[in-house]
Amino acid sequence: CNTIVKRNNKWIGYNTDAEGFHNSLLEFLGTKNLKRWKVAIIGAGGAARAIAYVVKKLKGKACIFNRTLSKAKSLAQEYGFDYAPLSSESLSKLELYSSLIIQSTSIGLGVGEKEISTPENDPLSFYNFKGYEYVYDVIYHPQVTPILNRAQMSGCKTINGFNMLKYQGYKQFELFTGVKYEDS
């Protein structure tokens, strides 16, 4: 829950992650479904849960990669997805699920822009981008994380989490005011 609204003297909690991600993803990819996409979801926390929900809703096939395998397994089983450890031992599986790579961990948050990629600031430091991948990092500050920098240098289409945040804000505005926000 990231938004609380009082309705009829009761507090109701909402999570706007899924809607924010959904709208920004459709805008990024220019498609309304993921039927032909094999998606790697990096991480298994709260943002990953919303992302998995959206990927399933859009009929995508996904694999959840996480450092703690039990968390990856739990989230993957909830949505009927594959799962694997987030490490170089899963490289072949990552390559199978690499048409869209969604980075949802906090790794890379707060590092300097254009900082050299290391395992401490890039969860996929072991992966060599081929240039065909679409790479989405939910982090919006810095604007270019080490993973996005490497992906861009390889010719991948990339996006950070700013539009997800923007669409979450639109939904929160609607929840608070009862008026749908119109982007001008």
Name each model feature, range by range.
Residues 1-31:
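Phosphate/diphosphate ligand-binding glycine-rich loop within oxidoreductases
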Residues 15, 25, 35-56, 66:
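Glycine-rich adenosine-cofactor-binding loop
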Residues 23, 27, 53-57, 77, ...:
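Short, well-ordered alpha-helices that flank and scaffold nucleotide-derived cofactor binding pockets
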Residues 31-38, 130-131:
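Short helix-loop-beta connector
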Residues 36, 133-184:
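Adenosine-phosphate binding glycine-rich loop
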Residues 58-79:
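NAD(P)-binding Rossmann-fold cofactor-contacting core
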Residues 82-158:
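Rossmann-like adenosine-cofactor binding region
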